């Protein structure tokens, strides 16, 4: 295990104290005042990275706030930790692992030696194997057991083996060009698998079982049920034609009946929530093809290079991560809304939930000591304009501060005329995007509402206080490269915050105990004889009620 030196308490540093005092001075200042005093901030508090134009001017920060936040980042040695990550140092200290999701998108001619191996060569060996396989699948050379070509791939995974591929597949659905669609199964609830397979033909269905160890309970339970669905229809010999694996466990893959030539590996330096650009993205490559998948990877790399080389003062992921930390630790915010004005990004907020909350939802620092401040932003959201008719009421007039990220595109992939036939529905969508960020920031005062002739007793109900912060991220079009850029933008925000909090953003011990306890409880709830009493009266009563309603002795 890598030795971990005692970390300094960031909250006890002069840089933290300077921010606290700065907050005391400006924390209640309204965005209206910020814009009046600094009329150029709407043009100047922006940064462009690749295809992403990022406007952070509608945040409750001044140029001095940003300077102090950058000082805090340097106090936490953010640049040094960033360089260690890119170099393959074992910064995942609790598991003694390198953190190299950035290596997954390095170009073929790059070299990165980690633990004696050129990991770039390893990455491209797997990418080449994925490309060769998906070429065969997409051309119809690979067929099912009956000789029919595959028309549906079903990805069976959970967590990072599911959330990433689901999100990317939906976001890039327009790039499907070979007559192959994808579906996804993750939940051990049998309803998930049953509903997914209900209208599929076993003869034209291929399963991708994604599990690094090939022992994940939910994934193997679903995979076994899927294998039964195939063998009942096509016989045992069909398994090799209808299953491939994303795993590193050859023995268990072979035992399952999958030809290990059709096993695609990845590495322990890739965490699940950072793995959609690895072999975990095989289902995506099957649908959009290897060239579009390469464009997807190139988008990540654009932001990686920016994060690695840009000064902190103009480094987009660093600035956005620092602003998120400003709200979490100094302004009292607990969550961040992610609001894509693109229905194709409907699962983006759910994807970011795992990325951010599994990474930074920690109460122990990397050296084993307790944290001394709040950590981990709670991410949530829905696409616009749906969210406007669901929860924006709280954003506008509620008592909780919820910074929001708005994501939109200038050029639609889909468009239709508006009701009168002369306008663009995409223009209507984006007019809502711009209006919401404007109204959240500047609101509407009682005087302005009264001047419109509103009855006095109604005026208080219509006041929009404003001063609700947001980031606007605008790109030309949702392409594979742009999607990669967006994901990397958030990956490196997570890293930035984690370094300052002094936590290990790349382990997830908090998910383990529940899985262990579930295994222990399974025989208790299924046994024919009376179950042993549980250690707490609540669980004991719940188990007994469940057993009774399942017709078992309680």
Swiss-Prot record:
Catalytic reaction equation(s): alpha-D-glucose 6-phosphate = beta-D-fructose 6-phosphate
GO CC, alphabetical: cytosol
Active site: 358 (proton donor), 389, 515
Compartments where found: Cytoplasm
Region (Disordered): 527-554
Annotated Basic and acidic residues bias: 542-554
E.C. code: 5.3.1.9
Biased composition (Polar residues): 527-540
InterPro entries linked: G6P_Isomerase, G6P_Isomerase_C, Phosphoglucose_isomerase_CS, SIS_dom_sf, SIS_PGI_1, SIS_PGI_2
Family matches, as Pfam families: PGI (PF00342)
Keyword tags: Cytoplasm, Gluconeogenesis, Glycolysis, Isomerase
GO biological process: gluconeogenesis; glucose 6-phosphate metabolic process; glycolytic process
Enzyme class: isomerase
Disulphide bond pairs: none
Pathway annotation from the record: Carbohydrate biosynthesis; gluconeogenesis; Carbohydrate degradation; glycolysis; D-glyceraldehyde 3-phosphate and glycerone phosphate from D-glucose: step 2/4
Function field: Catalyzes the reversible isomerization of glucose-6-phosphate to fructose-6-phosphate.
NCBIfam families: PRK00179.1
HAMAP family per the UniProt record, alphabetical: G6P_isomerase (MF_00473)
Family membership: Belongs to the GPI family.
Name assigned to this protein: Glucose-6-phosphate isomerase
Organism in which the protein naturally occurs: Mycolicibacterium paratuberculosis (strain ATCC BAA-968 / K-10)
Gene encoding the protein: pgi
């Amino acid at each position: 295990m890598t030795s971990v030196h005692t970390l300094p308490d960031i909250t006890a540093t002069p840089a933290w104290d300077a921010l606290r005092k700065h907050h005391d001075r400006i924390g209640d200042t309204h965005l209206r005042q910020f814009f009046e005093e600094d009329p150029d901030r709407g043009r100047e508090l922006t940064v462009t990275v690749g295809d992403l134009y990022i406007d952070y001017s509608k945040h409750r920060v001044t140029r001095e706030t940003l300077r102090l936040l950058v000082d805090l980042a340097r106090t936490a040695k953010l640049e040094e930790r960033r360089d260690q990550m890119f170099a393959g140092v074992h910064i995942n200290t609790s598991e003694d692992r390198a953190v190299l999701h950035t290596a997954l998108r390095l170009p073929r001619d790059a070299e990165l030696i980690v633990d004696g191996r050129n990991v770039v060569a390893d990455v491209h060996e797997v990418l080449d194997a994925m490309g060769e396989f998906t070429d065969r699948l997409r051309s119809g050379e690979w067929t099912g057991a009956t000789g029919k070509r595959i028309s549906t791939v079903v990805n069976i995974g959970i967590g990072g083996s599911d959330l990433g591929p689901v999100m990317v597949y939906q976001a890039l659905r327009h790039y499907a060009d070979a007559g192959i669609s994808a579906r996804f199964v993750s939940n051990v609830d049998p309803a998930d698998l049953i509903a997914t397979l209900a209208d599929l033909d076993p003869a034209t269905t291929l399963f991708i079982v994604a599990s690094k160890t090939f022992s994940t309970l939910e994934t193997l339970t679903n995979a076994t049920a899927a294998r039964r669905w195939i063998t009942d229809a096509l016989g045992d010999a069909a398994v090799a034609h209808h299953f491939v694996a994303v795993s590193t466990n050859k023995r268990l893959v072979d035992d399952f009946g999958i030809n290990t030539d059709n096993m695609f590996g990845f590495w322990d330096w890739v965490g699940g929530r950072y793995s959609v650009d690895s072999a975990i993205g095989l289902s995506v490559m099957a649908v959009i093809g290897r060239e579009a998948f390469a464009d997807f990877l190139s988008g990540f790399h654009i932001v990686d290079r920016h994060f690695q080389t840009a000064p902190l003062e103009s480094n987009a992921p660093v600035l956005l991560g620092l602003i998120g930390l400003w709200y979490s630790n100094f302004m009292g915010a607990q969550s961040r809304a992610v609001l894509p004005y693109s229905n194709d990004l409907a699962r983006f907020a759910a994807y970011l939930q795992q990325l951010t909350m599994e990474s930074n939802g920690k109460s122990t620092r990397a050296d084993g000591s307790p944290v001394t401040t709040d950590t981990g932003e709670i991410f949530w959201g829905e696409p616009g304009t749906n969210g406007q008719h669901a929860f924006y009421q709280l954003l506008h007039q509620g008592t909780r501060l919820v910074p929001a990220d708005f994501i939109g595109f200038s050029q639609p992939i889909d468009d239709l005329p508006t009701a009168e036939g002369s306008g663009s529905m995409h223009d209507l969508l984006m007019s809502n995007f711009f209006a919401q960020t404007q109204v959240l920031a500047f609101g509407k005062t009682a005087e302005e509402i009264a001047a419109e002739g509103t009855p006095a007793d109604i005026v208080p109900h219509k006041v929009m206080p404003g001063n609700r912060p947001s980031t606007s991220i605008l790109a030309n079009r949702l392409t594979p490269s742009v999607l990669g850029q967006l994901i990397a933008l958030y990956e490196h925000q997570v890293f930035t915050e984690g370094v300052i909090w002094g936590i290990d953003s790349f382990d997830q011990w908090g998910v383990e105990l529940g899985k262990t306890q579930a295994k222990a409880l399974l025989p208790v709830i299924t046994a024919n004889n009376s179950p042993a009493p549980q250690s707490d009266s609540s669980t004991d009563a719940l188990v007994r009620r469940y057993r009774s309603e399942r017709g078992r002795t309680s």
